[in-house]
Structures are given as structure tokens and as C-alpha cells.
Swiss-Prot record:
Domain of life: Viruses
Localization (cell): Virion; Host nucleus; Host extracellular space
Function field: During virus replication, may deplete host UNG protein, and incude G2-M cell cycle arrest. Acts by targeting specific host proteins for degradation by the 26S proteasome, through association with the cellular CUL4A-DDB1 E3 ligase complex by direct interaction with host VPRPB/DCAF-1. Cell cycle arrest reportedly occurs within hours of infection and is not blocked by antiviral agents, suggesting that it is initiated by the VPR carried into the virion. Additionally, VPR induces apoptosis in a cell cycle dependent manner suggesting that these two effects are mechanistically linked.
Name of the protein in its database record: Protein Vpr
Entry's family note: Belongs to the HIV-1 VPR protein family.
Subunit text: Homooligomer, may form homodimer. Interacts with p6-gag region of the Pr55 Gag precursor protein through a (Leu-X-X)4 motif near the C-terminus of the P6gag protein. Interacts with host UNG. May interact with host RAD23A/HHR23A. Interacts with host VPRBP/DCAF1, leading to hijack the CUL4A-RBX1-DDB1-DCAF1/VPRBP complex, mediating ubiquitination of host proteins such as TERT and ZGPAT and arrest of the cell cycle in G2 phase.
Matches recorded under Pfam families: VPR
Stretches for region Homooligomerization: 1-42
Changes after translation: Phosphorylated on several residues by host. These phosphorylations regulate VPR activity for the nuclear import of the HIV-1 pre-integration complex.
InterPro entries: RetroV_VpR/X
Species for this entry: Human immunodeficiency virus type 1 group M subtype B (isolate YU-2) (HIV-1)
């Protein structure tokens, strides 16, 4: 006979609330690294494409995550995880001038 699952602790936040909190965190971080007019244009593009829908929220989250990842990967001056340009140039044996 089937039984109800045991209580597994406190219930997690609703998915929608978590998604909106993630979007706010990404927006705060993006403003630190990219020009506001550029981010505004991105937001306008998403709104014109998706309207005021969850698909639009998911799209802008995905785009901001990708942009920030690439930005950090190529060596953001605010980041401790980025590649430092001089090291990369030496490692490849190339010099930039």
C-alpha cells in the first residue's frame, strides 16, 4: 500500500519567487560590469520579443548569466576568477601592442 512521503523539513520557496530573486541578483551584478544604457536596451529587446511573460524572465536570466560568465572569464578587473591579460599573453607566447 502506498504511503504519503515523510515530512522532509521546511518547504522551499516557490519557484516564481526564487526566479525573481535570481533575476534581481543578476541585474545588480550586471549593473556593476556593463553600461546602464546597454542593459536597458537588452531589457527593451527582451520585452519586445517576449512581452511581460515568464519566458522573458527566463530569457533575460539566461542571457545575463552567459554575459557575466564570459565577462569574468576574459578577465574582469572586479573579479578574482578572471584571466589576467598579461599571463594569457605570456602563456600563448604572444605579445599585444
Amino acid at each position: 500500500m502506498e504511503q504519503a512521503p515523510e515530512d522532509q523539513g521546511p518547504q522551499r520557496e516557490p519557484h516564481n519567487e526564487w526566479t525573481l530573486e535570481l533575476l534581481e541578483e543578476l541585474k545588480r551584478e550586471a549593473v556593476r560590469h556593463f553600461p546602464r544604457p546597454w542593459l536597458h536596451g537588452l531589457g527593451q529587446h527582451i520585452y519586445e520579443t517576449y512581452g511581460d511573460t515568464w519566458a522573458g524572465v527566463e530569457a533575460i536570466i539566461r542571457i545575463l548569466q552567459q554575459l557575466l560568465f564570459i565577462h569574468f572569464r576574459i578577465g574582469c578587473q572586479h573579479s578574482r576568477i578572471g584571466i589576467i591579460q598579461q599571463r594569457r599573453a605570456r602563456r600563448n607566447g604572444a605579445s599585444r601592442s
